[in-house]
Amino acid sequence: MEKPLVSIVVVSYNHAHFLEENLNSIKAQTYPSIQLIVADDASKDNSIEVYENWLEKNNYPAIKNFHTKNTGLTTTLNECFDLIEGKYVKFIAADDYLHPEAIEKCVNKLEELGNDYGMVFTDTWAINNKSEITKDIADYNANQYLTKEELREKLVLGNRIAALTVLMRTEALKKTGKYPTDIIVEDYYRWLKINEYYWITNIPEKLAYYRLHEHNISKIRLNLLLEEDLILKMKFDKTGIGKQNIDNYFKLNYFKVKQNKKLITQYHQYPFKDKILSFCFNLNFPFLGYRILNKILKTFT
């Protein structure tokens, strides 16, 4: 029986040093039916040369999406949408790589569970720049034995799904649409969108290798990531499960968030917001004013 086609999209930006390891891991898959799409967002190193040499040397067919001008990750991903031919799809950064059985086990899982399941993810090893296994600082193996209902609910509390481990139904990917071009937490956004329409499942095995780099993320970018993460949690929380954490963040960072219109606007729209806190933000009250007002109102309720 013919196996369903899986599209693997490799995305690179200055990953020349790791590219061969990634591509070799795709070639080594035990699963036979793979469409390879390779994309590069105008790397400053010799990534495209490495791609071309590897593809020629291995006589491996691939669709190429190589940029001469840097456009950003989400634009690159959106372009690759239109190149996907498989029933299933995996996106992977070129500095990560896969266990030989990763695709086969993920396809088998989704085929077994049926169309109600939009994606599957696995556990992952964390590795350093020498491909040595190291400590998993992101705690990506925290969801091992959750039920589908628990996964659906807890995903709103935070992202514990490593993007390189995910295999999606292409139908689920296309139903949830292309990425907003201004988003930087694109993987978490995608899981939350799929979570609205499909069940998500996991395989509690380490079937991928996630590379941790030694350089530090800038403080500005870290703040942007935290801000966007919080906005996504407010947008997708349908039950109030994240209310306590969200309210606490706004209280602890009252002065800072009061100056952030994007965050405040989303908080006003959050169905489970602290109404007194929202009111004080609206009137630009100092935090002491919120505490006094909150205390007064609580004495009458």
Question: Can you say where each PLM-predicted feature lies in the sequence?
Answer:
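Short, well-formed alpha-helical segments that are part of the catalytic scaffolds
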Residues: H15-A28
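A conserved acidic beta->alpha catalytic loop
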Residues: S25, D40-E49, A93
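Conserved donor NDP-sugar-binding/catalytic core segment of glycosyltransferases
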Residues: E101-K135
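C-terminal subregions of glycosyltransferases and related glycan-biosynthesis enzymes
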Residues: V156, R160, Y189, Y209-T301
